[in-house]
């Protein structure tokens, strides 16, 4: 027993010495709580609500501090000034992608979300160009969303104003919009393969908010133990299989002179570069890039919509004002369009406040510095993970008085006109900002206004008893389950 104690002490000393060297040997990292051997600062964090822990630590250590996730240090940026300086003013230096084991195992450094360096730059540049040419952010995609919104309305009418859980239908719409861009076709909502794909997205989003996945990202060795990560990887395998089948169909019918969609454009690029020794345009990168676009374009929008309906149920006075504006500007005989937004300041403010309040991805994905840098008087070595707290910006009480309160007035001036805010960054900011931001904001506006144009939202309980608090608040904020009635107007 004495020998085991001595070995334990020696191991602890070795670990602490290693941590000290990482902190002081090559640079001077910001201060932070003292890490414990092996587990780092894990015991000082509330894995069910990381944001709460970061807020408390910021009060003690300031707007920039260091945390150890296991034995690996990460620098946390807390507050608008630090986040903007890093992501915008010095975007290139902070443009690396930090380690995220649960997805790194899947993507293997490919795609447009979890890649870094030239691979990321080239894949992102190509993807953005193709997506824009296919109508992303333009009238073409707006019309596609309007068509899908009408399909949603038809599906909601079939509920006959009976209580229903909106989750599945809210996933269908953004997923089908992505399908139309990537594969040039949509699916019926009762298509079995499509329903299974939606199930995978829904389950995985909920799993990402759980403490177990936070632990997995700190200790990837957990991969070899039983746990919810196994279901997550099983679901991803199903998603990849679905994507691969669609790509193979495209290969069989490809006409290089008439590309139909994103897959065709990528396959043509692959053919052009097949003789290059290190081309980024490979089948693996195509599959991963499609998976990235699907995940980013489906999960975030659908769950924001789910939170949105819950908030509108809780605040019927706000919902009534939005419907009044819809009636005045749009009426009931045409579909809402993006041009309407400039004439609907209150509705626009509500859309922004929903995204601010929901805070769907509280800490953004981890960044990494691409070189040794000096930042705020500290020396941060190349490769160090950077965690920007988006919550600290979206809930800044100087910019948004009473930030814990859902209040569209946060985005309205004294005259009732829409008021922009530089602090509005639910999609992160800078070079690593979400590539689908424009699409997501378009979907949110068009879908919610279309729903409220056709239905009155009826809660099953007193609005005062509705609790919009996330059921999980880890890497993502997971909305609670609920039912409501869509009563035709």
Swiss-Prot record:
Primary localization class, coarse: endoplasmic reticulum
Keywords from the named record: Endoplasmic reticulum, Heme, Iron, Membrane, Metal-binding, Microsome, Monooxygenase, Oxidoreductase
Residues reported in the UniProt entry to bind heme: 434
Gene Ontology process terms (BP): organic acid metabolic process; xenobiotic metabolic process
InterPro entries in the record: Cyt_P450, Cyt_P450_CS, Cyt_P450_E_grp-I, Cyt_P450_sf, Cytochrome_P450_fam2
Membrane topology type: Peripheral membrane protein
Protein localization: Endoplasmic reticulum membrane; Microsome membrane
Presence of the UniProt keyword Iron in the record: yes
Any GO MF annotation of the entry: oxidoreductase activity, acting on paired donors, with incorporation or reduction of molecular oxygen, reduced flavin or flavoprotein as one donor, and incorporation of one atom of oxygen
Enzyme Commission number(s) from the entry: 1.14.14.1
CDD domains: CYP2C-like
Cross-referenced Gene3D superfamilies: Cytochrome P450 (1.10.630.10)
Catalytic activity reported: an organic molecule + reduced [NADPH--hemoprotein reductase] + O2 = an alcohol + oxidized [NADPH--hemoprotein reductase] + H2O + H(+)
Induction remarks: Constitutively expressed.
Cofactors (names): heme
Principal EC category: oxidoreductase
Cellular component, GO, one term: endoplasmic reticulum membrane
Entry similarity comment: Belongs to the cytochrome P450 family.
Protein name: Cytochrome P450 2C3
Organism per entry: Oryctolagus cuniculus
Gene: CYP2C3
């Amino acid at each position: 027993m004495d020998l085991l104690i001595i070995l334990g002490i020696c191991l602890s000393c070795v670990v602490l010495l290693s941590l000290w060297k990482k902190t002081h040997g090559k640079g001077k990292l910001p201060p932070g709580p003292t890490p414990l051997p092996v587990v780092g600062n894990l015991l000082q964090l509330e894995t069910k609500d990381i944001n709460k822990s970061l807020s408390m630590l910021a009060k003690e250590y300031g707007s920039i501090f260091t945390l150890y996730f296991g034995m690996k240090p990460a620098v946390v940026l807390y507050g608008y000034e630090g986040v903007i300086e890093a992501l915008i003013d010095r975007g290139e230096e902070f443009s690396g992608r930090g380690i995220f084991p649960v997805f790194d195992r899947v993507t293997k450094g490919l795609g447009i979300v979890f890649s870094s360096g030239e691979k990321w730059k080239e894949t992102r540049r190509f993807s953005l160009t193709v997506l824009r040419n296919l109508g992303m952010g333009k009238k073409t995609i707006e019309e596609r969303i309007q068509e899908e919104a009408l399909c949603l309305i038809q599906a909601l009418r079939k509920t006959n104003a009976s209580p229903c859980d909106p989750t599945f239908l809210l996933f269908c719409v953004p997923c089908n919009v992505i399908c139309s861009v990537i594969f040039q076709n949509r699916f019926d909502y009762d298509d079995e393969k499509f329903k299974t794909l939606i199930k995978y997205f829904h389950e995985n989003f909920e799993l990402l908010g759980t403490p177990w996945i936070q632990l997995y990202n700190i200790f990837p060795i957990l991969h070899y133990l039983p746990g919810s990560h196994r279901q997550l990887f099983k679901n991803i395998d199903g998603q990849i299989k679905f994507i691969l089948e669609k790509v193979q169909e495209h290969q069989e019918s490809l006409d290089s002179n008439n590309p139909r969609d994103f897959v065709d454009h990528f396959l043509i690029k692959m053919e052009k570069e097949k003789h290059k020794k290190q081309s980024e345009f490979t089948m693996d990168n195509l599959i991963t890039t499609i998976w990235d676009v699907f995940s980013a374009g489906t999960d975030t929008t659908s769950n924001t919509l789910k939170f949105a309906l819950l908030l509108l149920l809780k605040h019927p006075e706000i919902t009534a004002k939005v419907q009044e504006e819809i009636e005045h500007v749009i009426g009931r005989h045409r579909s809402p369009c993006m041009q309407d937004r400039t004439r609907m300041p209150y509705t626009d403010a509500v859309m922004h406040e929903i995204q601010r309040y929901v805070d769907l991805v509280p800490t953004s994905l981890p960044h990494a510095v691409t070189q040794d840098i000096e930042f705020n008087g500290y020396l941060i070595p190349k490769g160090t993970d950077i965690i920007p707290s988006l919550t600290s910006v979206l809930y800044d009480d100087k910019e948004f008085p009473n930030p814990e309160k859902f209040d569209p007035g946060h985005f309205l001036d004294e005259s009732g006109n829409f008021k922009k805010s530089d602090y509005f960054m639910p999609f992160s900011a800078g070079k690593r900002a979400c590539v689908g931001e424009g699409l997501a904001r378009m979907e949110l506006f068009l879908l919610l206004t279309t729903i409220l144009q056709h239905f009155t939202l009826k809660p099953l309980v007193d609005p005062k008893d509705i609790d919009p608090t996330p059921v999980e608040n880890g890497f993502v904020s997971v909305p609670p389950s609920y039912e409501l009635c869509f009563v035709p107007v």
